[in-house]
Amino acid sequence: MTASLHIILDTDPGIDDAAAIAAALFAPQLDLQLITTVAGNVSVEKTTRNALQLLHFWNSDIPLAQGAATPLLRPLRDAAYVHGESGMEGYDFVDHQRQPLAKPAFIAIRDVLMNAPEPMTLVAIGPLTNIALLLMHYPECACNIRRLVLMGGSAGRGNFTPNAEFNIAVDPEAAALVFRSGLEIVMCGLDVTNQAMLSPDFLNKLPALNRTGKMLHSLFNHYRSGSMRTGVRMHDLCAIAWLVRPELFTLQSCFVAVETQGQYTAGTTVVDIEGRLGQPANAQVALALDVDGFRQWVAEVFACAP
């Protein structure tokens, strides 16, 4: 099968990011042209190191650019309590000498977009700082973005504060800018990602699959979004799944605003499902997931990896 969808992946690895990067690399329908890193699950130095380790593990020459070290206006609050201090605890990667590109992520994204023969899809599975910087410095690039598919937000409860999902809550000002940008946005939030569980039976079969399965199994043993006994949530993998298997998701056009001021609600995505605010829709929001179909696709794409 010829890859037909050219993508740029912005990420903050992160254990579930590792699974998403594997899918982005090895799903035959996708052509991954650039990876950029951002501070989120851990510091940007660590997310960059982790992404480079993964690319070395897979012997991939995909270019990688390091991005923002802090949110636009706030100090970084990370998720090392979920992913471990390194961000990818549980597997001993081989040392390598590879370095990121000598330019920041938002400039690397601009360069790829402006040199592409047609608009490209951005996939953001961390805080939206790099995407906001791109739009702030190079607003003309919006015409070269086919759509933005993101893992973030929630139409209901949060996983970082009572109402806010982690990726949005880390940099709500960046997220607010992105949702106001006019980009075509597909939002895969907690409403679907909390359903995206890999079962214990599925997890136990990973080591026999291939060396990627062995590596991911080792990482999942240290992942604190679920457990090997009850299943683990593949939040970031949902964004990649939508690219390849959109029929697995139920989407609704909604107006989405990001709260930036509330003492208790900063980072909340206000998803106007019933249209009460009278604002035009600015996102396609995923609200339900075919879990069995998702698991089948994950098994298929992991089997494509070495």
Curated annotation (Swiss-Prot):
EC nos: 3.2.-.-
Top enzyme category:
hydrolase
Q: Name one GO biological process term.
A: purine nucleoside catabolic process
> Which is one GO molecular function term here?
purine nucleosidase activity
GO annotations of cellular component type = cytosol
Q: SUPFAM superfamilies per the record?
A: Nucleoside hydrolase
Active site per the UniProt annotation: 235
Record InterPro entries:
Inosine/uridine_hydrolase_dom, IUNH, Nucleosid_hydro_RihC_nonspecif, Ribo_hydro-like
Q: Which CDD domains match?
A: nuc_hydro_IU_UC_XIUA (cd02651)
Question: What keywords would UniProt list here?
Answer: Glycosidase, Hydrolase
List the Gene3D superfamilies. Ribonucleoside hydrolase-like
Q: What does this protein do?
A: Hydrolyzes both purine and pyrimidine ribonucleosides with a broad-substrate specificity.
Q: Which family does it belong to?
A: Belongs to the IUNH family. RihC subfamily.
By its UniProt entry, which PANTHER family does this protein fall under? INOSINE-URIDINE PREFERRING NUCLEOSIDE HYDROLASE, NON-SPECIFIC RIBONUCLEOSIDE HYDROLASE RIHC
Q: What is this protein called?
A: Non-specific ribonucleoside hydrolase RihC
Species whose genome carries this gene? Salmonella heidelberg (strain SL476)
